[in-house]
Amino acid sequence: MLAQDRKRQWQVTLVKPGVWRIDDYFTASCYLVEGTEKAVLVDTGMGEGDLTGLLAALTRLPVELAVTHPHGDHMYHAERFSRVYLHENDIARLQEAPQQFRNAFSADCQSLPELCPIGEGSRIELGGGVVLEVAELSGHTPDSVVFIDDAHRALYTGDAVGSGYIALMICREEELEQTVSAYREGLEKFKKHLPRVRDYAWLGGHAVQENGCDERHQPDHFSGCSHYFNPIRAEVVLDMKALCEDILSERVTR
């Protein structure tokens, strides 16, 4: 029998015409979005298989990469793309201290791709009226972004809002108040988009975690019979903001 390696396998789901979700072994999700002139992959996952070959099988268009935040499970193998969209502050950090981003690139990476700075309101034109608009939502990282896709009535949130059972803030204990405050401010800033995107498909960076993170429940997810389901949606933004306020006011314990 042929040997199989889960790390090299992908699960591909057609979300809607022109949008595919690609899940890796690490429960990370990335999204291929097509326009008429080019396609954009939002994040990369951590899979070790032939990602560029998979993309070529899904679309005939040239594919660029848009990154929600510079963690390894969202921009691994970014050097395989000719152009990478990344928040302007993250590009500055990468150029100042590249060793801090070593896990985001392959061990054999020899040179960085073209890095295109983005920020609040930036627009990535894919052709045919398909545009990815950038909305900043700090918290998970200082400069996390969400990509809003009006043409497909979808938004790609990475880890900015959370994934089902968790919103992960990475900080030292003495930085907790500052980090939670930044997340609350980011959520408050993002609220202005809610009337526009409330009924869109909210597509997060770890779709399987919307069914819980217990590995015993993962087979339920893949077989389509989950007993737990907490999808990302507009209400989660409001819930997270309320939780931040409760933490900062010590109405809930840290």
Name each model-derived stretch:
Residues 235-254:
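C-terminal regulatory/interaction regions
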Residues 24, 49-50, 75-77, 142, ...:
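Short N-terminal helix/helix-N-cap motif within the alpha/beta-hydrolase-1
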Residues 46-126, 220-239:
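Active-site HxH/HxHxD metal-binding segment of metal-dependent hydrolases
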Residues 28, 49-50, 72-73, 132, ...:
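Short alpha-helical
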Residues 2-17, 39, 46-47, 83-138, 141-232, ...:
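Metallo-beta-lactamase
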Residues 7-57, 147-163:
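Conserved beta-strand hairpin/beta-sheet module of binuclear metal-dependent hydrolase folds
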